[in-house]
Structure formats: C-alpha cells, structure tokens
A protein has these predicted regions:
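C-terminal domain-tail junction helix/linker
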Residues: 184, 196-204, 208-227
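DNA-recognition alpha helix
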Residues: 27-40
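Acidic/histidine-rich, metal-coordinating catalytic segments
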Residues: 130-144, 164-167
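Short conserved beta-strand segments at catalytic cores or DNA/RNA-binding microdomains
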Residues: 84-100, 110, 118-122
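Active-site beta-loop-alpha junctions of metal-dependent nucleic acid enzymes
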Residues: 53, 103-127
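Short, basic alpha-helical nucleic acid-contact segments in DNA-binding proteins
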Residues: 49-69, 150-153
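Basic, short loop/linker segments at the boundary and entry of helix-turn-helix/winged-helix-like folds
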Residues: 1-23, 39-43, 48-49, 66-74, ...
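Mobile genetic element proteins and their domesticated derivatives, centered on retroelements
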Residues: 17, 31, 47, 76-77, ...
Length: 227
C-alpha cells in the first residue's frame, strides 16, 4: 500500500494496528497498551485515525478476494448500531454457509434502504453468482425492494423470496459475532466513522471465516496477515 508517505510510523506498523483493532475487538486504549508492550509508542487517538483512514481502504482492496458467494441461497437481515445515541441499521447478507456477502449501514429502515442494500450486494456479480433464493424476516420492505429490482432488471426474475424464520438463524448468529467487535466502541460519533470502522470489522470477519483461503498460501494466521 503506497498511501503511507509522510506518516511518522512505518506502513507495516499501521496495518498491524488496524488489523488487530478490527479483528480482535479491543478498545483503542487497550490496543495502545498492547502496542507499547511491543515497543511501539503510539497514542490511542492516532490508532483511531489510522482505523478511519485505512480500514475502508483495506476493505476496498480486499473486496475482490473475499466477496465471492459460495452459495446462491442468501440470508438477509438487519441489526442495530448506535450512532450518537440513536439507532441506525446495519443491513447484512450471508449465504447459507455463513459466508459474508455484503453489508450496508443506513440511518433508516425502509424499502428504499433495503433496495439500496440489495442493489449494492448484487452489483458486480456474475450471473452464476447471483442468488436464486433470498430469505428475510417478514418485514414488507424486502418484498417491495426485490420486486422493484426485478422490474429494473437488476435482480434475477426467477429469484425466490422466502420469509422462513429459522433459515435466518445463521445470520442472526453472525450478527452476534460482529457485535462482539462493535461492543468495545460504546457508540459511534457519526454515521461516517461508524461505517468506516464496520468495514474493517466485516472484512476481518470474512477473512476469519476463510473466505480468502485460496489466497492464504500458508493456511494460517500469518498467511491471513500477508493478504
């Protein structure tokens, strides 16, 4: 990554800190101490700025590596994320195997937001990668969004929309694991900073699930770090 010019710390140190924060669910102050124990004196506010700048960039550059659905049966749901004391909505999709498909943070929970998320998730996929089944809860917003996307040719006409509660157990369990990373934050200040941080959390969750395993030459945590 050539974006570290004029930075006081080496790029490897910055990526090390960003990766640890996004993968292990530690607070910025705890990570400051962990870095200090390894001989790197850096303030927690500096680590915060690194995460805001580089977590979205890491997600962007690694997206091609991990965002390839292994199943055409998707589970779609949203979970709550607090921003400035108010709830926002993190739309998420995984396939039936639990692999992350995509995510989108929205200030609203309605058909427009659902459509924007599903359009984002479908964008760039080959025809054979697009879902044949999408399972959601019984919120009417998803039915509206899927119907509109079909009418616009952005969603397969033959796609089946299911609303079977137990089928979404896999994504509800995945929400819980993501929340373990979000919990130490104790509330985001803005939607922008929340989304930037969540991008880091989501890409590290995807890597941890083995979604880029084909690029992990050693098959272990060191190989994951090299990606």
């Amino acid at each position: 990554m050539s974006d570290f010019k004029w930075r006081h710390f080496q790029g490897e140190v910055i990526l090390w800190a960003v990766r640890w924060y996004c993968r292990y669910g530690v607070s910025y102050r705890d990570l400051e101490q962990m870095m200090g124990e390894r001989g790197v004196a850096v303030d927690h506010s500096t680590i915060y700025r690194w995460v805001q700048k580089y977590a979205p960039e890491i997600e962007k550059r690694l997206r091609w590596h991990w965002r390839r659905p292994r199943s055409t049966s998707w589970r779609v749901d949203e979970t709550y994320v607090k921003v400035r004391g108010k709830w926002t909505y993190l739309y998420r999709a995984v396939d039936k195997l639990g692999n992350t498909v995509d995510f989108y943070l929205s200030p609203t929970r309605n058909a427009k937001a659902a459509k924007r998320f599903l359009g984002k998730a479908l964008n760039g996929l080959k025809d054979w990668e697009k879902p044949t089944v999408i399972n959601t809860d019984k919120a009417p917003t998803y039915a509206v969004a899927i119907s509109e996307l079909k009418a616009e040719g952005k969603c397969p006409k033959e796609l089946v929309h299911r609303q079977v509660k137990y089928l979404n157990n896999v994504i509800e369990a995945d929400h819980g694991k993501l929340k373990q990373l979000i919990r130490p934050v104790r509330g985001f200040k803005t939607l922008k900073t929340a989304y930037a941080t969540i991008k880091g959390f989501e890409v590290m969750r995807a890597l941890r699930k083995g979604q880029a395993a084909i690029f992990n030459l050693t098959g272990d945590i060191r190989g994951e770090a090299r990606i």
